[in-house]
Curated annotation (Swiss-Prot):
Residues that bind Zn(2+) 1: 69, 72, 79, 82
Localization: Nucleus; Cytoplasm, Cytosol
Alphabetical GO biological process terms: defense response to virus; DNA-templated transcription; innate immune response; positive regulation of interferon-beta production
Residues the record lists as binding Zn(2+) 2: 109, 112, 156, 159
Family to which the UniProt record says this protein belongs: Belongs to the RNA polymerase beta' chain family.
Binding site for DNA template strand: 326, 348, 353, 360, 366, 1305, 1323
The protein's name in its UniProt record: DNA-directed RNA polymerase III subunit RPC1
NCBIfam families xrefs: PRK08566.1
Cofactor note: Two Mg(2+) ions are coordinated by both the catalytic residues and the nucleic acid substrate to enhance substrate recognition and catalytic efficiency.
Catalytic activity: RNA(n) + a ribonucleoside 5'-triphosphate = RNA(n+1) + diphosphate
Gene3D superfamilies: 1.10.132.30, 1.10.150.390, 2.40.40.20, 6.10.250.2940, 6.20.50.80, RNA polymerase ii, RNA polymerase II, clamp domain, RNA polymerase Rpb1, domain 3
């Protein structure tokens, strides 16, 4: 079946809200067109037609193209379908409402059907229910409250009857424990029931214990009668909406039969028969069972038979709705799995996620991608084959009629052509493959629509899955080219995360002019050069472009005139074709004129004199030697002055993505997106041309080690092995000094791992010294285009230590890693050290270890992809409808305020030039000074500068800037003025003195024009950095946190410097934080000390915090048996207590023993001297003295004598800042409150990484800060930087309700009201049935709901309701009236 767009009428209507509810039996009958009674599908005559009153009756719609519906007469595409109904012989439970039915039964009296509350309580709850703004969440909470209150009562307030507990028993059965009585309360009904068994008990004693277990079976018939008798005034207390359904509607007495179009019969040609839908078959089974029960009732069969049939009918009705029921008895289990209604809705392929939230679309194409550096970065090459199929509906008007006529004449086979014409007044489309195209072209009129082929310059959307962030789908301009692949400039690989090893990408063609405009402005490649994650450029030069630019800008690259002109000519194409390039003056004049590569690179930035771009940049390169700035020996300090490269060779830092010192980023920020994109396109053409002419390749010769290198490598290996042997020897002789918190074995492992890891690094640096600078792998590593020094060192010198989960290869079987080695061997080779290089080849054991490490990486990647994908989906679902409003707040779709001002300052993370800051003042000032030298103006002194800046900033233009931003500017200007004063004082220039101007010009000088321009630029950039109202800040936040997650690892890392203090990082840690887990895997409390420079004091406090058990400080704990007494003797080790700095003595131990859960009274514990404690057990009736003594002996060592029981251990951490050692405690455990209250700990500076613990101790704001800090800490540890505004938004969303809500299905249900949104996330059926029970109304305002309903969402361009069109005539023109003409003006005769 083709999915058609559903339009009932031609009048535009908008869905304002959706009400959920339950249909009563009467409403079902009114909705249905026929009653279905026949269990047979087809009549037995020859033509095999559907049976009347059967499940396939054609009055319920049609599922065949050639048969019209018998009710409305429409065909398959237009008929919506009509319902039928089946009357059930006996009522059944509705599986979706089963929990609700039990809930109601627990709330009402099973005798009089009133709700089990007193009149006062009823009144109190009813008053609360009358509140107008009662939300869905409050309703659900209230129902739980009322239910809890009712379940505590067992006597009805209305009739005084006794009510037992109601619970589920078996499959779809409910029992009422009516006769399970408490001795105190004896209900007359219960007592008469018990009395009726008295004679039976006398004859058979076994009956008595079973009496209390007697239960009343509440079958659907009983329940239905109870529900019908519930008084109308009590129904609101069940939280049901009387308009949406009554309690009796929860029980099925009638089933609706859905229309045929949703359960079509498929006629198979192979065998003469049809394939019926699961629903159809299930309905026939239900009708069959109905008939069986009817026959049995009429013929008077045994009750047990009817009950069994009833159970089976009940099961079939349940499977019809939800076929994944658990707990079906084996004799009733269905033979084959079928799809019920719930299965059609739930899951990724269900209606909600598969057909409503996301669909397959027309006007799209997909094929393999290839690189093409000759395209501009905003272009994509589309194959002719695709261009002929994708069409755009263009309206005929005066300007394009001739062009469109030409296309119509070309027809569908020739490109550019057209496929269809739709004439203005008819709805019919005419296919241009057939018919007289010349005639059709001549008949084209204004207003007709021509579906023309895709042509050059069309806006298309280009996308690669997985779409992890908004830059995974961008708008490009199409260029129709031959061949069969999509091609685009390699600069755009990074945002798509694409490579050309067989990746495929999708292309969509927008179908309206508005869509094209919106795509170009909001999704255009040029508009998305930077990532919203932190404002770093993503679209930038990669791989070959970097290598080419690096080699081009080396110090020793020279060209003669012909070569220089030839290379520069490669940029003269497309829109740059006509520009006049000014060849700069040659650098070397004699003996031959030569130009440098740096000059040619400058042409890329500013090709002609009439180009206004004057970019300025000063930054360190990748190999900067650390001093001398532009006099760096490696020529790696890049200086660009007014678009001329003065020094430095370009590398990944200055051309590639991920750095804000990138030249394209400077162009984008100072000169706009078009200039940056043009420069990138010029580089993408010039670099490959230069590189292919020069030649650049890699071969085995590049990775062959020389003799010197091999010798150095063996020396390194021997030294390293020798050191390892010394460590192993020290362990064996017991001389190895243990690291704090580690066993001797762990210490040895850590030392050897450290020693062996260094070998590879040293071998790598030996490689670099040895290799020629023209070596290809070295060049690539130096300019950052591919690979690193470690890769080179692994290829040439030594592969190094293989680590598995951060440690050496573990022993597998029989205490060795492989059978090639001795048992318990600790040698480097036996534990995964690979001494060979890839060039020399690996031995079998080395190869095995290397594959172990590689496999770990692969498994990690596979697991991580699924984990992060689900995490991203949860984040997007919870954050999607957050949007910045016109009053600068961030609100959800229901109007809840999440933040009063986005990120605290309302600035856009994508527009940040510094780290989380809108501007980098120094760079702006340097740029202003270069562009406006103002040589003739006098320089300002310190005071003049401050006064001048102050007066400019008092102007009205600066009122729109935040105070904090103005303070930042003032602070910067003050620093600059101080620097100027210092320089002037140094050279003895006073403020009013005169000096030779040329000397003054060389010094730091700022003129009035410069300071004015500087402040103007700052203000301008600040205003541009404002977050625009309507931005989907929530979705951006979700993507900015989810997308780096895919690049993280799943591992647990060690704390730097502290052995074995494990801390979870990576994806599991992010998952813990956003799930708001109460028990996290590694809770760590960081405690600052009152005296942080005293190691002894730190040990003392550590003793107070760390849990110390009696067994750890006792020399022995023994039983003592005397003739008349027995007790346990505990001897304390005073030496150990003294060494550990514990504040423990015999008295405190006695107190601890009494306070523990050992049930020992203070009189039973005696203290003898300083170190002896006697514990005398008490005999009890249950066990003998001997056993009590044994229990005591076993449990006494576990008594906590000092410290916090939840803290397993504490480690002293040493910070070496500014030469001073600072001590703090890292506490493993969860009791933050107790740690903060410990004497010696600075409570105000103590933090925990457990959000729940912080919220419990310090409140919600502290929890919010913890979430921010923990996410940022985890990201920084993995080398990711995320703008703090994103993390702030996430933490605000998690905490804005006053409790920490996780981004899980439970947290989401507490944040969001919308049923559709929750149903489209998880637990689809549960949410829909709940909504029907409560009679919930969904106001369709969030993003998910709007997409499901096909309504524009109120985010972005959908935020405002009225678009003000400017420059219109203020007053409408006066139209001539009918009586204005002169003939009506009869002169009056006086």
């Amino acid at each position: 079946m083709v999915k058609e767009q559903f339009r009932e009428t031609d009048v535009a209507k908008k869905i304002s809200h959706i009400c959920f509810g339950m249909k009563s039996a009467e409403e079902m009958r009114q909705q249905a067109h026929i009653q279905v009674v026949s269990k047979n599908l087809y009549s037995q005559d020859n033509n095999h037609s559907p049976l009347l009153y059967g499940v396939l009756d054609h009055r319920m719609g049609t599922s065949e193209k050639d048969r019209p519906c018998e009710t409305c007469g429409k065909n398959l595409a237009d008929c919506l379908g009509h319902y039928g109904y089946i009357d059930l012989e006996l009522p059944c439970f509705h599986v979706g409402y089963f929990r609700a039915v039990i809930g109601i039964l627990q709330m009402i009296c099973k005798t009089c059907c009133h709700i089990m509350l007193s009149q006062e309580e009823k009144k109190q709850f009813l008053d609360y229910l009358k509140r107008p703004g009662l939300t869905y969440l409050q309703k659900r909470g209230l129902k739980k409250k009322i239910s809890d209150k009712c379940r505590k009562k067992n006597t009805c307030h209305h009739c005084g009857a006794f009510n037992g507990t109601v619970k589920k028993c078996g499959l779809l059965k409910i029992i009422h424990e009516k006769y399970k009585t408490n001795k105190k309360v004896v209900d007359p009904i219960v007592s008469s029931f018990l009395q009726s068994f008295e004679t039976a008990i006398e004859h058979n004693k076994e009956v008595e214990p079973l009496l209390g277990k007697a239960q009343e079976n509440l079958n659907p018939l009983v329940v239905l009668n109870l529900f019908k008798r519930i008084p109308a005034e009590d129904i609101p207390l069940l939280l049901m909406n009387p308009e949406a359904g009554k309690p009796s509607d929860l029980i099925l007495t009638r089933l609706l039969v859905p229309p045929l179009c949703i359960r079509p019969s498929v006629v198979s040609d192979l065998k003469s028969g049809t394939n019926e839908d699961d629903l159809t078959m299930k309905l026939t089974e239900i009708i069959f069972l109905n008939d069986v029960i009817k026959k049995h009732r009429i013929s008077g069969a045994k009750t047990q038979m009817i009950m069994e049939d009833w159970d089976f009918l009940q099961l079939q009705c349940a499977l019809y709705i939800n076929s994944e029921l658990s707990g079906i008895p084996l004799n009733m289990a269905p033979k084959k799995w079928t799809r019920g209604f719930v299965q059609r809705l739930k899951g990724k392929q269900g209606r909600f996620r598969g057909n409503l939230s996301g669909k397959r679309v027309d006007f799209s194409g997909r094929t393999v991608i290839s690189p093409d550096p000759n395209l501009r970065i905003d272009e994509v090459a589309v194959p002719v084959h695709v261009a002929k199929i994708l069409t755009f509906p263009e309206k005929v008007n005066k300007a394009n009629i001739n062009f469109l006529r030409k296309l119509v004449r070309n027809g569908p086979e020739v490109h550019p052509g057209a496929n269809f014409i739709q004439q203005r007044h008819t709805q019919m489309k005419r296919f241009l493959k057939y018919g007289n195209r010349e005639k059709m072209a001549q008949e084209l009129k204004f207003g007709d629509i021509v579906e023309r082929h895709l042509i050059d310059g069309d806006v298309v959307l280009f996308n690669r899955q997985p779409s992890l962030h908004k830059l995974s789908i961008m708008a490009h301009l199409a260029r129709v080219k031959p061949h069969r692949t999509f091609r685009f400039n390699e600069c755009v690989c990074t945002p798509y995360n694409a490579d050309f090893d067989g990746d495929e990408m999708n292309l969509h063609l927008p179908q309206t002019e508005e869509a094209k405009a919106e795509a170009l402005v909001l999704m255009g490649t040029k508009a998305n050069l930077v990532t919203p994650r932190n404002g770093e450029p993503l679209i930038a030069a990669i791989q070959d472009f970097l290598t080419g630019a690096y080699l081009l800008t080396l110090k020793d690259t020279f060209f003669d005139r012909a070569k220089a002109c030839q290379i520069i000519a490669s940029i003269l194409v497309g829109k740059d074709e006509k520009i006049k390039v000014r060849l700069p003056p040659p650098t070397i004049l004699k003996p031959v004129t030569l130009w440098t590569g740096k000059q040619i690179f400058s042409v890329i930035l500013r090709p002609s004199d009439d180009n206004p771009v004057r970019a300025n940049l000063r930054t360190k390169g990748k190999q900067y030697c650390g001093r001398g700035e532009d006099l760096c020996v490696n020529d790696s300090y890049v200086t660009i002055q007014n678009s001329e490269l003065m020094s430095g060779s370009m590398d990944k830092g200055t051309l590639g993505s991920g750095s804000k010192n990138n030249i394209f980023y400077i162009l984008l920020r100072d000169w706009g997106q078009n200039e940056a994109a043009d420069a990138m396109s010029r580089l993408a053409r010039l670099a490959p041309v230069y590189l292919s002419n020069r030649g650049f390749s890699i071969g085995i010769g590049d990775v062959t080690p020389g003799q010197g290198l091999l010798k150095a490598k063996y020396e390194l290996l021997n030294a390293g092995y020798k050191k390892c042997d010394e460590y192993i020897e020290a362990l064996n002789t017991g001389k190895l000094q243990q690291q704090p918190g580690c066993t001797a074995e762990e210490t040895l492992e850590a030392l050897i791992l450290k020693e062996l890891s260094v070998i590879r690094d040293h071998a790598g640096s030996a490689c670099l010294r040895e290799l020629d600078k023209s070596n290809s792998p070295l060049t690539m590593a130096l300019c950052g285009s591919k690979g690193s020094f470690i890769n080179i060192s692994q290829m040439i010198a030594c592969v190094g230590q293989q680590a598995i989960s951060g440690s050496r290869v573990p022993d597998g079987f029989e205490n060795r890693s492989l059978p090639h080695f001795e048992k318990h061997s600790k040698l480097p080779a036996a534990k995964g050290f690979v001494a060979n290089s890839f060039y020399s080849g690996l031995t079998p054991t080395e190869f095995f270890f290397h594959t172990m490490a590689g496999r770990e990486g692969l498994v990690d990647t596979a697991v991580k992809t699924a984990e992060t994908g689900y995490m991203q989906r949860r984040l997007v679902k919870s954050l999607e409808d957050l949007c910045s409003q016109y009053d600068l707040t961030v609100r959800s779709s229901t109007g809840d305020i999440i933040q009063f001002i986005y990120g605290g300052d309302g600035l856009d993370p994508a527009a940040m030039e510094g780290k989380d800051e809108p501007l980098e003042f120094k760079r702006v000032l340097d740029n202003i000074k270069a562009v406006f030298p103002c040589r003739s103006e006098p320089a300002l002194s310190k005071n003049e500068l401050l006064l001048s800046a102050e007066s400019i900033m008092k102007k009205n233009e600066f009122l729109c800037c935040q105070d904090s931003f103005l303070q930042e500017i003032k602070k910067f200007i003050k620093e600059v003025s101080e620097k100027i004063k210092k320089t002037r004082d140094k050279y003895g220039i006073n403020d009013n003195g005169t000096t030779e101007p040329r000397v003054l010009y060389q010094l730091d000088r700022i003129t009035p024009t410069q300071i004015e321009k500087f402040l103007e630029t700052c203000r301008d950039k600040y205003m541009r950095a404002q977050m625009e109202p309507g931005s989907a800040v929530g979705a951006l936040c979700a993507q900015s946190i989810g997308e780096p997650g895919t690049q993280m690892t799943l591992k647990t890392f060690h704390f730097a410097g502290v052995a074995s203090m494990n801390i979870t990082l990576g994806v599991p840690r992010i998952k813990e934080i956003i799930n708001a887990s109460k028990a996290i895997s590694t809770p760590i409390i960081t405690a600052q000390l009152d005296k942080d420079d005293d190691a002894d004091y730190a040990r003392l406090v550590k003793g107070r915090i760390e849990k110390t058990l009696l067994g750890e400080i006792s020399e022995y704990i023994e039983e003592v048996f005397l003739p008349d007494d027995c007790f346990i003797l505990v001897k304390l080790s005073l030496e150990r207590i003294r060494l550990l700095r514990l504040e423990v003595n015999a008295e405190t131990v006695r107190y601890s023993i009494c306070m523990s859960k050992l049930r020992v009274k203070p009189g039973d514990v005696a203290v003898h001297g300083e170190a002896v404690v006697c514990v005398t057990p008490r005999e009890n009736s249950k066990s003998s003295m001997y056993y009590v003594l044994q229990f005591l002996k076993e449990d006494l060592p576990k008594v906590v004598v000092q410290g916090i029981p939840e803290v397993s251990r504490a480690v002293i951490h040493i910070d070496e800042q500014s030469g001073k050692e600072k001590y703090k405690l890292l506490v493993e455990g969860d009791n933050l409150r107790a740690v903060m209250a410990t004497h010696g700990v600075k409570g105000t500076r103590t933090t925990s990484n457990n959000t729940y613990e912080v919220e419990k101790t310090l409140g919600i704001e502290a929890a919010r800060t913890t979430i921010i800090n923990e996410i940022q800490y985890t990201m920084v540890n993995h080398g990711m930087s995320i703008d703090r505004r994103h993390v702030m938004l996430l933490s605000d969303l998690m905490t804005y309700k006053g409790e920490v809500l996780g981004i899980t299905r439970f947290g989401l249900a507490k944040m969001k009201e919308s049923v559709l949104m929750l149903a489209s996330f998880e637990k689809t059926a549960d949410h829909l049935f709940d909504a029907a029970y409560f009679g919930q109304k969904d106001s369709v305002c969030g993003v998910s709901e709007c997409i499901i309903m096909g309504i524009p969402m109120n985010i972005g361009t959908g935020l405002f309701k009225l678009l003000h069109k400017a420059n219109r005539d203020p007053s409408p023109p006066r139209r001539p009236l009918i009586f204005d003409t002169n003939e009506f003006h009869i002169p009056l005769v006086t």
